[in-house]
Every structure is written in C-alpha cells, then in structure tokens.
Regions:
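Charged interaction segments
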Residues: 56-159
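Accessory recognition modules or surfaces
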Residues: 40-60
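Residues that cap or initiate secondary-structure elements
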Residues: 11-15, 51, 77, 103-105
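Short, extreme N-terminal segment that most often corresponds to the first beta-strand
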Residues: 1-46
Length: 159
C-alpha cells in the first residue's frame, strides 16, 4: 500500500541543523548513498542501500532499499494540524518532513521513527489515513512482537 506521510513539528524552528541527526539515523540503518538538493524552503533528501543484510532487524519483512524525504527548513505560513490536549490547550503543528511513498517500507520507517522520536519527542507523525501518532504510540507499535504492515493506516489507539 503506497501513501505519503509526514512528520509534523510544533515549534517553528524548522532548520537544517537537524538534518545531520536524520542522516545519522538513516546511516545507522544501512543507508550509505544519499542525495541532498536545496530547493530554498525545503531540502529534497533521498537515500538508498547498496546491499542487503539479513542479520539486521530493520530488514525483516521489508524489502525496501530507498527512501525519499522532503525536509522543510522554513516554517509553512499555516499549520497542518491543530491538536487539542486533555486540558483543552491547542497546539499548532507544521510540516517538517514529508515522506514519499511510505507503502511497502512500513517497517523501515517504523524503525526510523523509533530512533527519530528519541531525539525529537515533541514531534508527531501523521500516517496515511491522517491518524496522528506520538512518540509513545510509535514506541508501543515498535515493541510489539507481531505488528501489522499497514500500521500507519490504522488508528494508533487500536494498535
């Protein structure tokens, strides 16, 4: 199942300094070839793997070997989502990373998100069906023994 998804950031400091951390996460997962192109208000970032290693957990049930991400370094003029917490306080979230063609790379990206949220716990992930996932949701899904390959299309409360 293909679909584009995104990581949303609530603070307005989208900047290129975090790209280094994103690259480091992907490199630690076996991606060694990357391409970064500056488009002014966002970077087009793509990576791929040169080979396959069956010993790595991130390869289980996921035959993907490339990823395309658009990293927005300038905050959009309007928020993508406004989230209301239990106390009624509303928080605006802005697009930070747009991930192209999530689909059959669900486990690879779950692994990426698990590491990403260790560094940026206040960001949220917007799945293919516009469900919002917090760091806690991603951690819970990641730790499951059995998980659905379409987890990013399902309500995180049901997972």
């Amino acid at each position: 199942m293909a679909g584009d998804v995104q990581i949303l950031r609530r603070k307005g400091d989208n900047c290129c300094r975090d790209i280094k951390d994103i690259v480091n996460i992907l490199m630690s997962r076996g991606f060694t070839n990357e391409f970064l192109s500056d488009h002014g208000d966002y970077y087009l970032f793509s990576v791929n793997k040169p080979g396959y290693d069956d010993d790595g957990r991130w390869y289980l049930d996921d035959a993907s070997s490339w990823a395309v991400m658009y990293v927005h370094i300038i905050k959009d003029g309007f928020s993508i989502y406004t989230v209301e917490d239990a106390s009624g306080q509303k928080t605006d979230y802005y697009r930070y990373i747009y991930i192209e063609g999530y689909g059959d790379r669900a486990f690879m990206y779950l692994n990426f998100l698990h590491e990403y949220f260790k560094l940026f716990p206040d960001d949220i992930f917007s799945g293919a069906a516009d469900y919002l996932y917090t760091k806690e949701d991603i951690d819970r899904i990641y730790e499951k023994e059995i998980w659905s390959e379409i987890w990013h299309c399902l309500d995180p409360k049901t997972l």
